[in-house]
Swiss-Prot record:
II repeats lie at residues 700-972. Residues 1057-1074 have a biased composition (Acidic residues). Cannot form the same regulatory interactions with beta subunits as other Navs do. Interacts with the PDZ domain of the syntrophin SNTA1, SNTB1 and SNTB2. Interacts with NEDD4, NEDD4L, WWP2 and GPD1L. Interacts with CALM. Interacts with FGF13; the interaction is direct and may regulate SNC5A density at membranes and function. May also interact with FGF12 and FGF14. Interacts with ANK3. Interacts with PKP2 (via N-terminus). Interacts with TMEM233. Interacts with XIRP2; the interaction is required for normal action potential configuration in the heart. The modification Dimethylated arginine is found at residue 527. Residues 42-53, 492-504, 1018-1037 have a biased composition (Basic and acidic residues). GO terms for biological process: atrial cardiac muscle cell action potential; AV node cell action potential; AV node cell to bundle of His cell communication; brainstem development; bundle of His cell action potential; cardiac muscle cell action potential involved in contraction; cardiac muscle contraction; cardiac ventricle development. The lineage of its organism: Eukaryota, Metazoa, Chordata, Craniata, Vertebrata. The record marks 374 as: Cys residue near the selectivity filter, which has a free thiol that is susceptible to reaction with methanethiosulfonate (MTSET). It comes from Rattus norvegicus (Rat). Disulfide bonds join 281-336, 909-918. Glycans are attached at residues 215, 284, 289, 292, 319, 329, 741, 804, 865, 1367, 1376, 1382, 1390. Residues 1-130, 181-189, 238-250, 415-720, 771-776, 823-839, 945-1205, 1262-1270, 1320-1332, 1473-1530, 1583-1591, 1643-1652, 1774-2019 are cytoplasmic. Residues 508-529 have a biased composition (Polar residues). Na(+) channels in mammalian cardiac membrane have functional properties quite distinct from Na(+) channels in nerve and skeletal muscle. This is Sodium channel protein type 5 subunit alpha.
Length: 2019
């Protein structure tokens, strides 16, 4: 490979010539020859093992050439060059570079068979193609084309423009085809998928032009795809589209599951509601006799009943709407008023598109429910026509369908994004690794050169450096980041404070002095260094980098210290280095460690550590360097600015060819890494530099300098910041005070205020510029921001005289963002949004392209239809508001779909343009735009989100000026308080000594370590109200404010013994005064710190309102003495033991709750009644329990304690809570009519109150006040009981009707809250919520700030413009503006009293009203009316005109993007992160496990929970056994499943208006299925006998079959009184769950279902909490809104009159659906909308609402339910999805273990937990992957060394462990886990204990092999002996007498005996065949075969028996076995 590595620099660019092509062909031939010779298997395998060569990432086509290669010479730009990538050395390719150094790769084969790479035409085409102007031209053409396409009614001449565009696109494609070739080879035209798009666009253009294809506008729509060409032109967009396509691929499983679930729900809906929505209230009629069925009504006659029923004039309309009133015939459905009857008539609602009449419409309705679009309308229609009970169906669909499935889509998209991010990070790390290796090589070579004494000193000149600049945009963003984190202190030195990674970092002339030594180059550990090394978190910018040419790495900033390579010699003519040859130096790009000015002078920080900043440290590892707080700043450096003097080896050092070649090869590896240098080292132009020095840094004369110093002292003081912050808040308040109908004085005051604030901010800017100099002032982002706002404010002042420029006034609102400077959360959130918007730059572009394309498609396809058929959808004859006639309106419709509202506009579209096309377009926009792209937005938002920043944003120890100022104020106040107190005490007591002692005390440092002594009583009993422990007087060292004494650190959360506290105590208990003063003087003289109270306890005590909390008894103190460490000394104060000047340390509420002692603790005796403070003040509280009265009291307390602690008591109280809550539900509008119930409830109420008061008293006595009132849950009980008690007393005294008492009674609705503490599940959720409250409140506040800007803007734009004049007789529509122009005209025309000037109820008349309007817009409920009013508004108090102010839509679009998409989704982010944090706190185990360990742990966890089950025994009867075999086969299950699905299909075919024949056929098919399923049931029962009922699925099937049979027989009766029994068949679909396990391909769906199963327990808890919230709110609603007028969303069925109706309403608005409709009637305050004097049944008057209560009620409910509870639901699903995905990616899943045991049952039918060793091989083969070990598997199984017990049996756990280990791989961690799991298994299954293993499979194999070897040796020995003896005998017989004297070899023994016996009986010679039969002993194979032939013999027996088998005593056998 070495010869392929190209040299760096311009020498690497070689023209592509014919010789080059020949060389490539030669290399290809060589490669082929090599490939042909290496044919053997081994070499092929070896090649596979080697890493196949891959193309270099940084040399890919369309990437920028890496900087390492330098700038190509001008003459080579646009010319064919040899390919730089070694990968292509054996492929016919060449590259071309353009001016921007972008790489274009071409095929070197002939284009179009004719044009070779050297053909002039092709060369010209290539030159044109790579030129940047060419792509610019195409880009401009596309954009211009888009503008023309967006015209809805183009003039005739545009046709010629169209031809021009087509010509340009044709030219572009022609150039590409000529340059690249058409399609045969790589890199040709059609090999790029983006070119397919171009090609199809051109083909379509010509087709439509020359061929008449009918509907031209439809084909013209294809032109819009040209907009997609922008993606192919801008390379950055390609990555995004890649991510989108990836996420769509990942969505496949979710889509399948979604379609399946929706189909099931649609089927259920079809069965339940088919035809219901056509039931309407029809006017009564009479049928006329004697005619042909004609009917009469109201004196009119209709020809037939059908005609009458289809006449819309006969239907009753819903109040105030054009909707028909639906009704139903069931008891709880909607009813019709007098004169109407409920009949099935006419078409379905919403143009006939909302129905459950066929499967398709039902599916659409369910999809609409899932996306929650306008679902409240469907919900109300269905409940009205079918009955309220079906709310359950909607709950299931909303919670399982909508929340679960939609959020699964989010989870999958987020995960796809995350994976892509991880891949990018991995790729970058790979480059990093290669870079490190290259560094090592270079370092070694450099050391070698240094040792040889080569002169490596050289000058560096930047002009020769090839490092190209990074984009301006990136540099700016980095500067912004730096400045926002920097300090404002400019310092006096003349150096700008820029990091070395930012700003202009030109190294002009770096003096390079001494050579590099070894020591300077050794890598340093970061421990002793002034820098702390850390890896920067990987951001999300990599994937979505904004720069079009950026690679993934450019946006990673963890590569900041890199080696800048030296260029090699340019080969000059003489071969000597040219005069210009030089090398750039090595730059240490540390973060925050050096400053560089414009001239390139670099000063290093922290000069004390020479080694860290030594010139040689350019080879430091690439890390981000952080400066710890104690690093000195440049102005403090003793040595002043230093020069950076790096060392660079000269090129001459590489004169030897070997060294040079090595360096070359090393450098060539660096390509990818060096491309990612942080920034260019470009020098500022000297003229700018001089300009900055002269004009932007003002240091003219000493007088000016002193003025400047003084101004700086004032401006930089923390108090100045505090003042400015207060001004910002005040200014915001002033802006928020603007409202409609202001008085002149008020308006004037606001104007003066504005002038004042503008003056203040201008002055601040001016002073800061004076103090800092403009040069330094504008280095800070905040200052630039301030200056822009000030300039805009001044412009507004100047222009305000000219006219109403309220837009400029809106810019003042940006001042609110200045709060971010001192409000960390706001800062964090702005950063999050900034990061997302930055990362989303490209995604936004893609979304814009999608919106544009769909808007144009909609306009082209449907525009004409909207204008021609407008009468179908609009009564007024005007165009409807939502149409596609022009581009702007089409864009609005697409945007509305992205907001999730698609169904209503789709109905309109379907009405004018036909169903199929509209469905296709709208659902495409919905799925692509809303579900995928917007979820990608959300995924990005969540990924750039970190709750650490939100919950504890200021942990970096740097205090901002605001905190410093507040700390200073606090200190001042404390000083004033103390001196005042001392003064008063001195006068009162006349005790002069005390202050003196005190002074000594106060001067002591508060951090002296003191031995702990028991606290003096006074110190211990400081009342919490007086504690100052949360505040702190001083900061850390080095952060002191001016005028401080030496820094002192004060521990926080410690009961400090401040003097005033002690003296207050002395006042109260004079008896202990002497003792106290002694102890105090002891503390002072001994230098001891007062007793430190335990932190957690003091926190609890501070939060309670009693004075009790802080005390601890002597025993407690001794206990703490043992456990608590000593108070830390000053030097080692722990981080959390002092608060950095902050106003207060926030207590974590969740921790607090956990620290509150639970009442249910098992303590033997009650605690003290009172706190010790109370006892000291009132000695009478102290009772002596040893004496008589006290003894009785103590006994009483113990008895009470026993009662309260008893479990029955708690159960009784829970029962009473539930009863009392239930009683509240009966107090509805009808209570007055039901006298008995009313009386009963009154008595019950009293009884409950008594019970709860008694419970409270019992607990007081049992627990004592101290314990009772330090428990938050007890406080809750106490307050709720108080409410009941007060209302009871008021009733008794007759004050029940008083207003305050009435409103207090409604607080009884809080009773159910008492159940919270009693139910564990709910308590867990509440604790989690309470933990999240601080961050939720933070986000809520930030949202309010964000919204405040939009609200104020809304007030500026729309205040007073939402009014209109209406005529009451004509409904709520405004009159035409030509009739009534404004409010005064309306009032003057109002002669009849029927004209009213009214406002839209929700408006922008003030900031509060604006907030409500924005909430409706953000939740997309009621936003239409607000937008219509805004768009129609003309002027102040003027009559609106249709779409007069059209572009006001843009205000709402912008608000929806920032106010809704971002801010509302931040809630999800906060909640998810809180969950993760709490998990970290609780689940510590995971954090300390390696990934490997976790993998084993999870596998073992699953493993331990299983054990073998006894299978159902096979019947003995032959026929039963046969059936049993069939029934237990998997195929049988699959067949039945298939039949179930078929049954579902037949059910889907049903429709409401089907013909009688169809009904008949379906009934027969249904009977057939009933018969089949009955047959299945009978067959299974026959096979399985009584075991059939041991499986719950079988019982379920049995019930369904019985119901089906009963349903078929009694169908008429059942359908009349119940619902259709076919419904049960739908439930059968649940059986699909069983099949999913068997289908390996369904793994993804199994994961999703598994995630749901994991979520269920948590979701149940959240559901309970949600129910509780709904219950409480419904009680409140009944109390406040029962008599509100029926209009908008409130009617006879959905109202707050009864508990059930309230619950219907609240369930609906849980998803925020339709809350605007419910709120609307409550906002009515008087005529003409409601009547305040209407009498009600309970004695109250009026049907008006109370707006304040209503708004509070609905907004709090929406925030609690929609934003918190529902988002918790989402968080849990996301969390569990990621867990389930992790589980599914693990090698072994739960299913694998299930399958193992299922197969085990077949091998171990008795469930003994053992199988025979001989069956092991078959068992291993029978398993499914990944546990399966396919045959032949003997060797693998033997190697596992499985333990065997007697009887050659192996335990299932041993096998499972071994197989698991095989899958997961060897690991040391396995053994410990195995032991742990075995213990667990032993406990669960005692059967294994009695069997001790006697051998293992491996040892058994060893024994068998040993036995075989011994046997063979012995046989060989025997054979030799027998051969000898045989030959002797042969000779004896054949040889005659001469041999008779010969002795026999063996005279005795087995062989002699047998042979002699044989030969004595037989004299005939043996045949040759018998000789060969036993010549050789059995082979090794036969032994192993015998083993496998199921012989149940043990090893020891085995060897013996084989020996004997060879020599049986039978004579016949002997005869056969011997020669």
């Amino acid at each position: 490979m070495a010869n392929l590595l190209l040299p760096r620099g311009t020498s690497s660019f070689r023209r592509f010539t014919r010789e080059s092509l020949a060389a490539i062909e030669k290399r290809m031939a060589e490669k082929q020859a090599r490939g042909g010779s290496a044919t053997s298997q081994e070499s092929r395998e070896g090649l596979q093992e080697e890493e196949a060569p891959r193309p270099q990432l940084d040399l890919q086509a369309s990437k920028k050439l890496p900087d390492l290669y330098g700038n190509p010479p001008r003459e080579l730009i646009g010319e064919p060059l040899e390919d730089l990538d070694p990968f292509y050395s054996t492929q016919k390719t060449f590259i071309v570079l353009n001016k921007g150094k972008t790489i274009f790769r071409f095929s070197a084969t002939n284009a179009l068979y004719v044009l070779s790479p050297f053909h002039p035409v092709r060369r010209a085409a290539v030159k044109i193609l790579v030129h940047s102007l060419f792509s610019m031209l195409i880009m401009c053409t596309i954009l211009t084309n888009c503008v023309f396409m967006a015209q809805h009614d183009p003039p005739p001449w545009t046709k010629y423009v169209e031809y021009t565009f087509t010509a340009i696109y044709t030219f572009e494609s022609l150039v590409k085809i000529l340059a690249r070739g058409f399609c045969l080879h790589a890199f040709t035209f059609l090999r790029d998928p983006w070119n397919w798009l171009d090609f199809s666009v051109i083909v379509m253009a010509y087709t439509t032009e020359f061929v008449d294809l009918g509907n031209v506008s439809a084909l013209r729509t294809f032109r819009v795809l040209r907009a997609l060409k922008t993606i192919s032109v801008i390379s950055g967009l390609k990555t995004i589209v890649g991510a989108l396509i990836q996420s769509v691929k990942k969505l496949a499983d979710v889509m399948v599951l979604t379609v399946f679930c929706l189909s099931v729900f649609a089927l259920i809906g079809l069965q339940l509601f088919m035809g219901n929505l056509r039931h309407k209230c029809v006017r009564n009629f009479t049928e006329l006799n004697g005619t042909n069925g004609s009917v009469e009504a109201d004196g009119l006659v209709w020809n037939s009943l059908d005609v009458y029923l289809n006449d819309p004039a006969n239907y009753l309309l819903k109040n105030g709407t054009t909707d028909v009133l639906l009704c139903g015939n069931s008891s709880d459905a909607g009813t019709c008023p007098e004169g109407y009857r409920c009949l099935k008539a006419g078409e379905n609602p919403d143009h006939g598109y909302t129905s459950f009449d066929s499967f398709a419409w039902a599916f659409l309705a369910l999809f609409r429910l899932m996306t929650q679009d306008c679902w409240e309308r469907l919900y109300q229609q269905t409940l009205r026509s079918a009955g309220k009970i079906y709310m359950i169906f909607f709950m299931l669909v909303i919670f399982l369908g909508s929340f679960y499935l939609v959020n699964l889509i989010l989870a999958v998209v987020a995960m796809a994004y995350e994976e892509q991010n991880q891949a990018t990070i991995a790729e970058t790390e790979e480059k990093e690794k290669r870079f490190q290796e290259a560094m090592e090589m270079l370092k070694k070579e450099h050391e070698a050169l240094t040792i040889r004494g080569v002169d490596t000193v050289s000058r560096s000149s930047l002009e020769m450096s090839p490092l190209a600049p990074v984009t301006n945009h990136e540099r700016k963003s980095k500067r912004r980041k730096r400045l926002s984190s920097g300090t404002e202190d400019g310092g006096d030195d003349r150096l700008p404070k820029s990091d070395s990674e930012d700003g202009p970092r030109a190294l002009n002339q770096l003096s390079l002095t001494h050579g590099l030594s070894r020591t300077s180059m050794r890598p340093r550990s970061s421990r002793g260094s002034i820098f702390t090394f850390r890896r920067r978190d990987q951001g999300s910018e990599a994937d979505f980098a904004d720069d079009e040419n950026s690679t993934a790495g450019e946006s990673e900033s963890h590569r900041t210290s890199l080696l800048v390579p030296w260029p090699l010699r340019h080969p000059s003519a003489q071969g000597q280095p040219g005069p210009g040859a030089s090398a750039p130096g090595y730059v240490l790009n540390g973060k925050r460690n050096s400053t560089v000015d414009c001239n390139g002078v670099v000063s290093l920080l922290g000069a004390g550590d020479a080694e860290a900043t030594s010139p040689g440290s350019y080879l430091l590892r690439p890390m981000v360097l952080d400066r710890p707080p104690d690093t000195t700043t440049p102005s403090e450096e003793p040595g002043g600015p230093q020069m950076l003097t790096p060392q660079a080896p000269c090129a001459d050092g590489f004169e030897e060819p070997g060294a040079r070649q090595r360096a070359l090869s090393a450098v060539s590896v660096l390509t990818s890494a060096l491309e990612e240098l942080e920034e260019s080292h470009r020098k500022c132009p000297p003229c700018w530099n001089r300009f900055a020095q002269h004009y932007l840094i003002w240091e003219c004369c000493p007088l000016w300098m002193s003025i400047k110093q003084k101004v700086k002292f004032v401006v930089m003081d923390p108090f100045a910041d505090l003042t400015i912050t207060m001004c910002i808040v005040l200014n915001t308040l002033f802006m928020a005070l603007e409202h409609y109908n202001m008085t002149a004085e008020f308006e004037e005051m606001l104007q003066v205020g504005n002038l004042v604030f503008t003056g203040i901010f201008t002055a601040e800017m001016t002073f800061k510029i004076i103090a800092l100099d403009p040069y330094y002032y504008f280095q800070q982002g905040w200052n630039i921001f301030d200056s822009i706002i000030v300039i805009l404010s001044l412009m507004e002042l100047g222009l305000s005289r000219m006219g109403n420029l309220s837009v400029l006034r809106s810019f003042r609102l940006l001042r609110v963002f200045k709060l971010a400077k001192s409000w960390p959360t706001l800062n964090t959130l702005i950063k999050i949004i900034g990061n997302s918007v930055g990362a989303l730059g490209n995604l936004t572009l893609v979304l814009a392209i999608i919106v544009f394309i769909f808007a144009v498609v909609g306009m082209q396809l449907f525009g004409k239809n909207y204008s021609e058929l407008r009468h179908r959808i609009s009564d007024s004859g005007l165009l409807p508001r939502w149409h596609m006639m022009d581009f702007f309106h089409a864009f609005l419709i697409i945007f509305r779909i992205l907001c999730g509202e698609w169904i209503e506009t789709m109905w309109d579209c379907m009405e004018v343009s036909g169903q199929s096309l509209c469905l296709l377009v709208f659902l495409l926009v919905m799925v692509i735009g809303n579900l995928v792209v917007l979820n990608l937005f959300l995924a990005l938002l969540l990924s750039s989100f970190s709750a650490d920043n939100l919950t504890a944003p200021d942990e970096d120890g740097e205090m901002n000026n605001l905190q410093l100022a507040l700390a200073r104020i606090q200190r001042g106040l404390r000083f004033v308080k103390r001196t005042t107190w001392d003064f008063c005490c001195g006068i009162l007591r006349r005790r002069p000594k005390k202050p003196a002692a005190l002074a000594t005390h106060s001067q002591l440092p508060s951090c002296i370590t003191a031995p702990r002594s028991p606290p003096p009583p006074e110190v211990e009993k400081v009342p919490p109200a007086r504690k100052e422990t949360r505040f702190e007087e001083d900061k850390r060292p080095g952060q002191g404010t001016p005028g401080d004494s030496e820094p002192v650190c004060v521990p926080i959360a410690v009961a400090e013994s401040d003097t005033e506290d002690q003296e207050e105590d002395e006042e109260n208990s004079l008896g202990t005064e002497e003792e106290s003063s002694k102890q105090e003087s002891q503390v002072v003289s001994g230098g001891h710190e007062p007793y430190q109270e335990p932190r957690a306890w003091s926190q609890v005590s501070e939060t309670t309102s009693s004075e009790a909390g802080a005390s601890t008894s002597q025993a407690d103190w001794q206990q703490e003495q043992k456990t608590e460490p000593q108070a830390p000394g000053c030097g080692e104060t722990p981080e959390d033991s002092y608060s950095e000047g902050s106003t207060a340390d926030m207590t974590n509420t969740a921790d607090l709750l956990e620290q509150i002692p639970d009442l249910g603790e098992d303590v033997k005796d009650p605690e003290d009644c009172f706190t010790e403070g109370c006892v000291r003040r009132c000695p009478c509280c102290m009772v002596d329990t040893t004496q008589s009265p006290g003894k009785v009291w103590w006994r009483l307390r113990k008895t009470c304690y026993r009662i309260v602690e008893h479990s029955w008591f708690e159960t009784f109280i829970i029962f009473m809570i539930l009863l009392s809550s239930g009683a509240l539900a009966f107090e509805d509008i009808y209570l007055e009519e039901r006298k008995t119930i009313k009386v009963l409830l009154e008595y019950a109420d009293k009884m409950f109150t008594y019970v709860f008061v008694l419970e409270m008293l019992l607990k007081w006595v049992a627990y004592g006040f101290k314990k009772y009132f330090t428990n938050a849950w007890c406080w809750l009980d106490f307050l709720i009981v108080d409410v009941s008690l007060v209302s009871l007393v008021a009733n008794t005294l007759g004050f029940a009707e008083m207003g305050p008492i009435k409103s207090l009674r409604t607080l009884r609705a809080l009773r159910p809250l008492r159940a919270l503490s009693r139910f564990e599940g709910m308590r867990v959720v509440v604790n989690a919520l309470v933990g999240a409250i601080p961050s939720i409140m933070n986000v809520l506040l930030v949202c309010l700030i964000f919204w405040l800007i939009f609200s104020i803007m809304g007030v500026n734009l729309f205040a007073g413009k939402f009014g209109r004049c209406i005529n009451q007789t004509e409904g709520d529509l405004p009159l035409n503006y030509t009739i009534v122009n404004n409010k005064s005209e309306c009032e003057s025309f109002n002669v009849t009293g029927e004209l009213y000037w009214t406002k839209v109820k929700v408006n922008f008349d003030n900031v509060g009203a604006g907030y409500l309007a924005l909430l409706q817009v953000a939740t997309f409920k009621g936003w239409m009316d607000i937008m219509y009013a805004a768009v129609d508004s003309r002027g102040y108090e003027e009559q609106p005109q249709w779409e007069d102010n059209l572009y006001m839509y843009i205000y709402f679009v912008v608000f929806i993007i920032f106010g809704s998409f971002f801010t509302l989704n931040l809630f999800i982010g906060v909640i998810i992160d809180n969950f993760n944090q709490q998990k970290k706190k609780l689940g510590g185990q995971d954090i300390f496990m390696t990934e490997e360990q976790k993998k084993y742990y999870n596998a073992m966890k699953k493993l331990g929970s299983k054990k073998p089950q006894k299978p159902i025994p096979r019947p003995l009867n032959k026929y039963q056994g046969f059936i049993f075999d069939i029934v237990t086969k998997q195929a049988f299950d699959v067949t039945i499943m298939f039949l179930i699905c078929l049954n579902m299909v037949t059910m889907m075919v049903e429709t409401d208006d089907q013909s009688p024949e169809k009904v008949n056929i379906l009934a027969k098919i249904n009977l057939l299925f009933v018969a089949i399923f009955t047959g299945e049931c009978i067959v299974k029962m026959a096979a399985l006998r009584h075991y059939y009922f041991t499986n719950s699925w079988n019982i379920f099937d049995f019930v369904v079959v019985i119901l089906s049979i009963v349903g078929t027989v009694l169908s008429d009766i059942i359908q009349k009184y119940f619902f259709s029994p076919t419904l049960f068949r739908v439930i059968r679909l649940a059986r699909i769950g069983r099949i999913l396990r068997l289908i390996r391909g369904a793994k993804g769906i199994r994961t999703l279902l598994f995630a749901l199963m994991m979520s269920l327990p948590a979701l149940f808890n959240i559901g309970l909490l949600l129910f509780l919230v709904m219950f409480i709110y419904s009680i409140f609603g009944m109390a406040n809104f029962a008599y509100v007028k029926w209009e908008a969303g409130i009617d006879d069925m959905f109202n707050f009159q009864t508990f059930a109706n309230s619950m219907l309403c609240l369930f609906q608005i849980t998803t925020s659906a339709g809350w605007d409709g419910l709120l609307s009637p409550i906002l009515n305050t008087g005529p003409p909308y409601c009547d305040p004097n209407l009498p009600n049944s309970n004695g109250s008057r009026g049907n008006c609402g109370s707006p304040a209560v209503g708004i509070l009620f609905f907004t709090t409910y929406i925030i609690i339910s929609f934003l918190i509870v529902v988002n918790m639901y989402i968080a849990i699903i996301l969390e569990n999805f990621s867990v389930a995905t992790e589980e599914s990616t693990e090698p072994l899943s739960e299913d694998d273990f299930d399958m193992f045991y299922e197969i085990w049952e077949k091998f171990d039918p008795e469930a003994t937990q053992f199988i025979e060793y001989l069956a092991l091989s078959d068992f291993a083969d029978a398993l499914s992957e990944p546990l399966r070990i396919a045959k032949p598997n003997q060797i693998s199984l033997i190697n596992m060394d499985l333990p065997m017990v007697s009887g050659d049996r192996i335990h299932c756990m041993d096998i499972l462990f071994a197989f698991t280990k095989r899958v997961l791989g060897e690991s040391g961690e396995m053994d410990a886990l195995k032991i742990q799991m075995e213990e667990k298994f032993m406990a669960a299954n005692p059967s294994k204990i009695s069997y001790e293993p006697i051998t293992t499979t491996l040892r058994r194999k060893h024994e068998e092999v040993s036995a075989t070897v011994i046997q063979r040796a012995f046989r060989r020995h025997l054979l030799q002996r027998s051969v000898k003896h045989a030959s002797f005998l042969f000779r004896q017989q054949a040889g005659g007498s001469g041999l008779s004297d010969e002795d026999a070899p063996e005279r005795e023994g087995l062989i002699a005996y047998m042979m002699n016996g044989n030969f004595s009986r037989r004299s005939a010679p043996l045949s040759s065949s018998s000789i060969s039969s036993t010549s050789f002993p059995p082979s090794y194979d036969s032994v192993t075969r015998a083993t496998s032939d199921n012989l149940p013999v043990r090893a020891s027996d085995y060897s013996r028996s084989e020996d004997l088998a060879d020599f049986p005593p039978s004579p016949d056998r002997d005869r056969e076995s011997i020669v």
